[in-house]
């Protein structure tokens, strides 16, 4: 997690978010005014290679400086030292290494994130389980040696996936995994948490127009575009390679987060196996969904909900999202229908003839 966070490229120019970042929305006059004012503000920008993908920070504020970008790079480096599964110096690595043996003292940030992950697990009945690491390791999807595990291996890994076996000591600020072989994996909330931390930094420094793009799947719009127009975010076509879009959505001072079968997968025996695993079965989720996109004020919530609602499926996932205050979503099903919550239907503009809004 957060590999190569120290490698930074300074850049200006076109903004790439999901498939693309287009002009502002609103009335036509507002759009022209907002777009013109946005063009007059040259963003201060940095691109990091993090989380095995490219992330871009663009700050559209005349007060922004290179120092702010350096601070954000350092902030992401700090998160790496807390939440990386592969960095041997990280809190999470040490907690996993001591599984079944000892409680591990961690930073306040790590403690809070893991507690949040357990809260999400409780709220979703274990469908979003931060102890899913053994299953993720077993499938190894996204790497060259990914393959379908045998049933005995799968059952052994599934038995180790149990968030109820994660214990916390508030006074000592320690985390313990009760069973040997348990593995924490915060991939379902890690990018969202990091995006929230960057957003908090920007707001605390009075930088109120910015875009945070972590890997194309987790986007935070801090404020509106210069001039007050909305941002138009391109929506990934789940049947195409990264950069192809099915349409756009308008956001303003919000987060958008997507999960889908297109991100990481392998094919064995003519069957496609994607990376979104169902802790109940140990297998990739198969429920007729291609992708889900969440719009929320909070990036950590959006990151978690996009995975949890995907595992729930269309009917249960939609009902769950509609119970969450301040959260909207749309689901893309295998028949290319888009099922959106009421608050999103008028904000999605389709550009691909292959997709349609359900109910139209």
Regions found by a protein language model. Name each.
Residues 2-360:
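Mature catalytic core of soluble alpha/beta enzymes
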């Amino acid at each position: 997690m957060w590999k190569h966070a120290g490698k930074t490229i300074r850049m200006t120019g076109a903004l790439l978010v999901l498939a693309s970042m287009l002009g502002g929305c609103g009335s036509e006059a507002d759009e022209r005014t907002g777009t013109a004012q946005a063009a007059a503000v040259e963003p201060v920008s940095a691109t990091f290679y993090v989380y095995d993908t490219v992330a871009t920070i663009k700050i559209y504020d005349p007060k922004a400086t290179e120092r702010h970008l350096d601070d954000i790079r350092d902030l992401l480096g700090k998160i790496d030292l807390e939440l990386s599964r592969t960095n041997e110096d990280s809190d999470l690595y040490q907690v996993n290494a001591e599984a079944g043996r000892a409680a591990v003292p961690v930073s306040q940030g790590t403690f809070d994130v893991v507690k949040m992950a357990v809260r999400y697990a409780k709220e979703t009945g274990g469908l979003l389980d931060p102890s899913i690491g053994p299953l993720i390791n077993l499938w190894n999807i996204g790497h060259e040696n990914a393959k379908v595990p045998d049933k005995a291996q799968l059952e052994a890994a599934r038995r180790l996936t149990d968030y109820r076996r994660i214990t916390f000591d508030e006074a000592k600020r320690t985390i313990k995994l009760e069973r040997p072989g348990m593995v924490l994996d915060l991939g379902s909330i890690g990018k969202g948490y990091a995006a929230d931390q960057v957003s908090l930094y920007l707001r605390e420094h009075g930088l109120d127009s910015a875009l945070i793009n972590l890997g194309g799947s987790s986007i935070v719009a801090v404020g509106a575009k210069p001039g007050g127009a909305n941002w138009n975010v391109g929506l990934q076509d789940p049947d195409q390679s990264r950069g192809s879009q099915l349409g756009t959505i308008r956001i303003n001072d919000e987060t958008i987060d997507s999960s889908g079968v297109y991100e990481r997968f392998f094919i064995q025996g003519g069957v496609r196996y994607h990376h979104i695993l169902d802790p109940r079965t140990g297998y990739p989720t198969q429920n007729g969904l291609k992708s889900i996109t969440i719009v929320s004020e909070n990036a950590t919530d959006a990151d978690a909900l996009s995975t949890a609602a995907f595992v729930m499926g269309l009917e249960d996932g939609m009902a769950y999202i509609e119970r969450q205050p301040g959260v909207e979503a749309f689901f893309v099903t295998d028949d290319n229908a888009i099922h959106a919550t009421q608050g999103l239907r008028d904000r999605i503009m389709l550009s691909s003839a292959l997709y349609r809004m359900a109910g139209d």
